[in-house]
């Protein structure tokens, strides 16, 4: 039997003592003193930061939002049942982060970047913070590349450029989401990554959007962030910032991205809800004083950044490429009141707005764009040349027609010029109607607008304008493939292409039925 040597035992103990590392982890902790509606009051967190993640019992997290003299006000991220007064809360020393990268494309996630589509975990490349400072003046480049939506009336009258913020505003049930989803569908094959942020919507509505994106093959380049109506106000408040951080991943690496916020009215409501529960002083319409900053700091992050910024950010890996993040925020108005607090705020922050009107929608004019109130403040410089040449008079025709049509209801005898303007306006209105989920190529849009501007529609019955357009495009795409390919490639109407297109339209009119 082997005997233990006492000197060996003492040597082993000495070695263990010498190798012992005393690591002390200091973490500030406090206790919950009150809990109501997902808002915590915590006592004892002395060195907590504003916006810091707080560790709650049961693997949950909170977000510090009010730092007061004797307590901290925080919101619970997610479900708050099971928490009670006296529970211990610990500081984490981290601000909130979400996963970013190409692994998120094709997935549906919540405001924290956690998958909710049942397709397993997301293998994210890296994480980034939710709240970031927007690029400075020197890092930006002017908007001069078109972001085609595939919707004739938008591309012709209120063009959108890459890096622009274009507001979509209107009452409920006027087709706001339809316009945004069509814009996403039109990015197929254009190397633009899309992010759709659903805030405060029914889960069934979001599921319907995801189904349509999958059906049309758009989900492969799209990430959906869902903060449904059933989720806490904190998640609805944070979802747009999470989506913006995911979009900035592409912008900062010299790629192009499109983000849709559907809709920011619900985010403002969620923020008002949180602020009132945190006992912050209410202002106009009971919103807190910083509700303008809530949206401005989000929308200013959508920008076109120059090649120097991209090169510096990627440490020289990407050279000579600009990046862009285009934002389409949606605002829901009440009874067409665009002068309410949140709509006026967002109108002043964005680079233009597409105003959708209930009366036009109910009259069957869809998309229901009001040509007079809709504007694009920077998109004109980015508009495709062919659309700019052909669509210039469309907006004026429509605005004059709407004005004259209202006047003509009371006048019995109209002069010839007025009657012609009204007849032309009727045909242009009919031409700009477009079915949902059917975005058009530049060549198709150009051919349709050419038919209107060249007077080819003047002798077509109003009821036959849409069948005429459909038959004309089918004819051109089958019999004049080279012409349409030339327009699609050059995105301009040269004299040669114009002659060919004019001849093709005349040939179609002389021998086709529609």
Curated annotation (Swiss-Prot):
It catalyses: ATP + H2O + 4 H(+)(in) = ADP + phosphate + 5 H(+)(out). It is an enzyme of class 7 (translocase). ATP binds at residues 170-177. Its EC number is 7.1.2.2. GO terms for molecular function: ADP binding; ATP binding; proton-transporting ATP synthase activity, rotational mechanism. The record marks 374 as: Required for activity. InterPro entries: ATP_synth_asu-like_sf, ATP_synth_asu_C, ATP_synth_asu_C_sf, ATP_synth_F1_a_nt-bd_dom, ATP_synth_F1_asu, ATPase_a/bsu_AS, ATPase_F1/V1/A1_a/bsu_N, ATPase_F1/V1/A1_a/bsu_N_sf. It is found in: Cell inner membrane. Produces ATP from ADP in the presence of a proton gradient across the membrane. The alpha chain is a regulatory subunit. F-type ATPases have 2 components, CF(1) - the catalytic core - and CF(0) - the membrane proton channel. CF(1) has five subunits: alpha(3), beta(3), gamma(1), delta(1), epsilon(1). CF(0) has three main subunits: a(1), b(2) and c(9-12). The alpha and beta chains form an alternating ring which encloses part of the gamma chain. CF(1) is attached to CF(0) by a central stalk formed by the gamma and epsilon chains, while a peripheral stalk is formed by the delta and b chains. HAMAP family: ATP_synth_alpha_bact. This is ATP synthase subunit alpha. It comes from Acidithiobacillus ferridurans. The lineage of its organism: Bacteria, Pseudomonadati, Pseudomonadota, Acidithiobacillia, Acidithiobacillales. The gene is atpA.
């Amino acid at each position: 039997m082997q005997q233990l040597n006492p000197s060996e035992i003492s040597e082993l103990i000495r070695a263990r003592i010498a190798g012992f590392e005393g690591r002390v982890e200091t973490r500030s902790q406090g206790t919950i003193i009150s809990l109501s509606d997902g808002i915590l009051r915590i006592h004892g967190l002395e060195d907590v930061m504003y916006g810091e993640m707080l560790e709650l019992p049961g693997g949950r997290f909170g977000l510090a939002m009010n730092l007061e003299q004797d307590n901290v006000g925080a919101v619970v991220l997610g479900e708050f049942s099971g928490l009670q007064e006296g529970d211990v809360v610990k500081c984490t020393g981290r601000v909130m982060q979400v996963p970013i990268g190409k692994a998120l494309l094709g997935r549906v996630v919540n405001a924290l970047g956690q998958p909710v589509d049942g397709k397993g975990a997301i293998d994210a490349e890296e994480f980034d913070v939710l709240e970031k400072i927007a690029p400075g003046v020197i890092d930006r480049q002017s908007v001069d590349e078109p972001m085609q939506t595939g919707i004739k009336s938008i591309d012709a009258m209120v063009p959108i450029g890459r890096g622009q913020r274009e507001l979509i505003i209107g009452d409920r049930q006027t087709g706001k989401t339809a316009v945004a989803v069509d814009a996403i569908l039109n990015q197929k094959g254009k190397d633009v990554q899309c992010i759709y942020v659903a805030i405060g919507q029914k889960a069934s509505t979001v599921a319907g959007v995801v189904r349509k994106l999958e059906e049309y093959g758009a989900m492969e380049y799209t990430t959906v962030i869902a903060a449904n109506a059933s989720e806490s106000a904190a998640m609805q408040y944070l979802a747009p910032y999470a989506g913006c951080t995911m979009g900035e991943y592409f912008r900062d690496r010299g790629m192009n991205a499109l983000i849709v916020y559907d809709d920011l009215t619900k985010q403002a409501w969620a923020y008002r809800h949180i602020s009132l529960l945190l006992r912050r002083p209410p202002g106009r319409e009971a919103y807190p004083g910083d509700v303008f900053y809530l949206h401005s700091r989000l929308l200013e992050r959508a920008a076109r950044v120059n090649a120097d910024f991209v090169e510096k950010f990627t440490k020289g890996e990407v050279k000579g490429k600009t990046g862009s993040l285009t934002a389409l925020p949606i605002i829901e108005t009440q009874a067409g009141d665009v002068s309410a607090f949140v709509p006026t705020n967002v109108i002043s922050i964005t680079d233009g707005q597409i105003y959708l009107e209930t009366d036009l929608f109910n009259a069957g004019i869809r998309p229901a764009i009001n040509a007079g109130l809709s504007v694009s403040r920077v998109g004109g410089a980015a508009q495709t040349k062919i659309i700019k040449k052909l669509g210039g008079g469309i907006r004026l025709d429509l605005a004059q027609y709407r004005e004259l049509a209202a006047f003509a209801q009371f006048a019995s005898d109209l002069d010839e010029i007025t009657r012609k303007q009204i007849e032309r306006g009727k045909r242009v209105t009919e031409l700009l109607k477009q079915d949902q989920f059917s975005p058009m190529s530049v060549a198709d849009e150009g051919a349709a607008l050419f038919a209107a501007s060249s007077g080819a529609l003047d002798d077509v019955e109003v009821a036959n304008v849409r069948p005429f357009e459909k038959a004309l495009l089918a004819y051109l795409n089958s019999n004049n493939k080279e012409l349409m390919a030339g327009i699609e490639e050059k995105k301009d109407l040269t004299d040669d292409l114009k002659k060919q297109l004019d001849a093709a339209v005349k040939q179609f009119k002389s021998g086709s039925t529609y």
